Every structure is written in structure tokens, then in C-alpha cells.
Amino acid sequence: MKTNKIGVVFSGPILSSIEREIREKESERLKSNLVSILTALDFKNEVVAAGGEIYAVGGIVRDAIMGRSSDDLDIVIRGVPYEKLFSILSKYGKAVDTSLTDENGKKDFGATKFVSHNKTFNEILANNGIRKEIDIMLPRKDSKDLNAKGHRSIKSDVNHMYTIYDDLMRRDITINAVALSYSGRIIDKVKALDDIKNGVVRAVSEDSFIDDPLRMIRAVRFAAKFNFQLDDRTLELIRINAPLLADKKELPKERFLMEFEKMVGKSDMSRAVKLLVDLGLYESMFGVQPKFGDYNKFAHAKSVEDFSYMLFEGQDSNEIVSLVTNNITNAVAILNYVRAIVKYVDEVKEAGLDKLNRTLALAAIYNLSPDMLTTSYYVNSNDKVVGGQFQRKELPAGNNDVEFKGDEFKNFVLDMLEKNQMTQDLSRIGKAKTFALRAIYNDEIGNNKEDIRNFLETNLSWLK
């Protein structure tokens, strides 16, 4: 059993001495603030008087030690039965029971979402960048059901008399298995502090990934997020257990999506995907070999939509949407996005050297996701130049970027219709704009009012 006072700091093997000093000072500040928050809890005195112990756990403690801010406060309270604890919490704020229900409809009665009625306390949270909704839980302890398999074999029991050590030992990786009491004591049974200091991601136990195979993706995510190294035994355990990710009955795709949502934009995506491939997780998850080319493209994935397409780029166009549907999500918005990217990338390939149609397809991709024009290996160096022109507004990426626009353009089109004795059809405005846009893409005219006006006055096919 290992306990540490609040003075333990993050050093990190990848930081310069100046960066380390700054990080250490920030770590001290954040840990001190977290202790102050725990001390300021409205219900603290009554819970302690009832025999309770209060601990901040998980990410917020890990991040404070590392000198990083966090917006979620998770608390474990032991020593007080749930009914009594819930009654106490309800005196001081809005308490909502969020206890889990098992497959037989039985609740475990161990979790509450709490929002304090105390405005001053909520201001303290806000000033520290922490959401006012706090997750409060009783300690849990995992046990195995030998008649079941995978994560279903793990029974998570809730009991107010379990220790904080019991609760920490059920966590996924050591850097998440750390707690902080309101007295400023850090509770660490698994050398979490050493792993944080040395930049290591290590499984809490030999069974961590058997208990829940999604933890392998989570381990990769944290390694990529913090630029930590997976320790040798954890690497070995991931390689051994990677095939467990293929069982979609045990692991619904919604859980994969949740992990990817937490990964995108918050991690070194290029490194994360390379780890997924090198450790055999990619093939186990998706049942195919990767064909997406350069790992560096994933650094540009800013959304789960982009990421979902990039993971399968290079596969047959007809298979990409199916791979996303079968392995990641049925969400209509994501699937429609992936279908659109597939369609426009196919149009880029089909256009070949046809400048007009290629630029139209590139514009369509750009309007969906500017980053795709820097990542897709179907896009050549000239296409990337075009993407830069879109970004700098040197080339219109759509009708709204054509320089001749607004009421002036509308009145010009209506005047042209009148001169040619045609019906004042407002739909002709969009048709004229598209006609001009195509001419700009084809290098027939520049994107300026005079060129566009002269072109439309002398090329009347848009009126037909």
C-alpha cells in the first residue's frame, strides 16, 4: 500500500527542464485547488460525521498531478450506506440517482449526479473550469463469473464498506487508478505516480483487457493523448488479447464510436492509428487490412466523421460505407457524410485531367471538410494548391464565394431576363451563378464582377 502527500510532481521524460518546472508549479496549483474544492463541498462535514471518506478519483486527479486542467469531477464516498448518502446529498443540492441496472432489472444503487444549490461553490467549480454536475459513487469491486465470458464475466459489486483501494484496482490503466482525499493525501496502490512521472501507460492487472477488450483502445488513446509509452508487458497483453475485439456480440459498435469520439481531436491521431495497426487491433476490430496510406493524414482528423472515412480510405468505394456501418455507427449524419466523401472522391478519380470536373469535385470535398484536401491520397499536389486557393478565398469554393453577388447580381440577372423577354424566374439567379463558377474553374474568366458580367452578357446559354 502506497500513500503520498501532495508534493509528488510530474516530471515526464519528454519535457525540458524549463517545461518541467512550469508543469510542476501548475501541478501544485491544480492539486491545491482540487483539495480546496473537496474541502468546500457543502455535504462534507455531514458525510464525515456519518463515518464517510471522500475522494476525488480518476482523470481529474491524474490531470492535476500532470499539471493539466480537467472539467469533470468524479468522487467516491465510502463508509456511508447509499440511502443515507443520497438523503444527505439531497439536502445540499439536486441529486439524481444514476445507478446501473443489470439485465434482470436490479439496481446496484451506487451512483448519483449532484449539482450543489450553493452558488459560491458552483462559482469555485466554474473558476477552475469544472462542470457543476458532479458524479458521486460508492466504491465498487469487481469479481469474475466463471460461467460467462468477456466483459460480461465481470460482476461489479457496490458496497459502501469496500475500500478506496478496492475501487482503484478495478480501473483500466494505472495512471487512472489514483485518488486524492480532502486532506491532500494521494492514494496510489499501483505505482500510478511513478508511471505518470515516467510517461508510461500500464495495465492495472493481467486481466484488464480480458475483462473489457475496449480497454486496449483506451490504453492506445491515452498513450497518444499524453505522448506516453505503453510498457512492454502491456504491449504483450494487447497483442495477445487483440482478437477479442472481433466479437461484435460482446462489444457493440456504439462502444467503439464512444472511444473514437474521445480520441479525435484530443490525441496524436497519427500515432494512435499506427498503434492500432501495429498491435493488431485494427484488423481485429474491422476484419480488413488497412489501405489508407500515410499515417500522417490522421493528424488532420478533426471530427469522428473525417476519422470514420479515413480509417477505410483505399478500400473499395462500395465497401467503405458498409465498413463504417458494421463497425462504428448507424448514425445517419456520419453515414451521409461518409457517403458524400466517397462520392466526391470517386468524382475526383473519374475526372482525371479534366480541370473543370476535377475542381467541381474538389470544391464539393472542401465544403464538406477542408482537411480532406490535404489528406486523401487521391488528391495530387495541384489539387492541394486548389485547396489552398479555396482556403484563401482566391478561388470560390461555391456559389456564395463568387465575387459578383447580392442584390446587384440578382438585379443584373432579372434585367437580362427582361431584355431577352423571358419570365422573371428567380431560379435563374442560381443557374447564372453556377454558370459563372464553372467558367472560373475552367480558367475562362477571373473571379471578379467585370469578368462575370461580361461573360454572362456574351454567353447566353444559361438563359435556356
Go through each PLM region and give its residues.
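Catalytic cores of the polymerase beta-like nucleotidyltransferase superfamily
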Residues: K2-K464
